[in-house]
Amino acid sequence: MNIKSTWVVFLTLLFFIPFAPSLAADSSGTSMPPMQAIAAAIKKVAFSPSSSTPAKNDLKEHIAEQQEAIVFTAPPRETPEQGMEIYKPVAEFLSKTIGERVVYKHPGTWGVYRTEMLKGGYDIVFDGPHFNSYRMEKLSHNILVKMPERFEFAVIVLKEQKISTVAQMAGRTFCAHAPPNLGTLVLLSQFDNPSRQPVIISTNGWDNIYAGVASGKCLGGVVPVANLKKYDRAGNMKVVLKTQAMPNQAFSAGPRLSAEDQTKIAQALLSPDAAGPTAKLRAAYKVGDSFALANNQEYRGLAEFLRNEWGYY
């Protein structure tokens, strides 16, 4: 309520207080105590619905919902503002590609991301291979294009540690991203006994994970092999587990998009025309010059890493 409205309410009260006894009767003839009558008058004036125009962003979302727009999203790894900067150009590019309105929607939290995904609220998604695999198996999504470099993870400790297997690290501290990050889920999958699970010290950024192990903050860490090669030029780390290579992050599309439109999206994202609209996305995730064609088969089975995450199975 603005200052002008506050003065109106105040002056109204000054006028009506002398007549509170007469206000204390409602339309049915029953009596209300004077102060309750005044409170009712305040509530009616102060909390009546505003006729002001909705906020610009709310209005855009309302219009999008009314038009049944195709919803494009990605995990909440960025702030809403950063997400808009990275993904909005992609959404606009895809709108032109299929001739339908595609809107980018930031999920806000991982909980909202999971909930909306499971109920089919997202039509086009860019995220990790385990999520792509899950949507393919459970939500009838098709995987269209991917980051060309394959993913390998390494579980690391300092060389001087007398550890040679992951099993020896049960119950010990690990610097890692919070689940459901794929690297962390790969690590947790190595421990079947819940009472022997490692202690995850939530750490954002592969460089910070490496630094946490190097400084002794954590006994171990999990990082992509490609990142380890870049960080550990001095050879300070020992690899106690190296995963098999798996496909990388990818775009998937759901059943609200026809097979024809899904093909158009894949072709568009691989075309030279995508260079500008996807530039910030490719820079943020070090994709390289372009994406690569993907298929469902290569992602099959990776959803198993979500097996012990709440809500998926």
Which residues make up each language-model segment?
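Sec-exported extracytoplasmic/periplasmic mature domains
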Residues: S95, G99, L118, D192, ...
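Periplasmic-binding protein-like
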Residues: V71-R77, E149-V157, R233-D273, A283-E309
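Stable alpha-helical elements in mature extracytoplasmic
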Residues: I86, V90, T109, Y113, ...
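Acidic, polar ligand-binding/catalytic clefts
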Residues: P107, G111-Q168
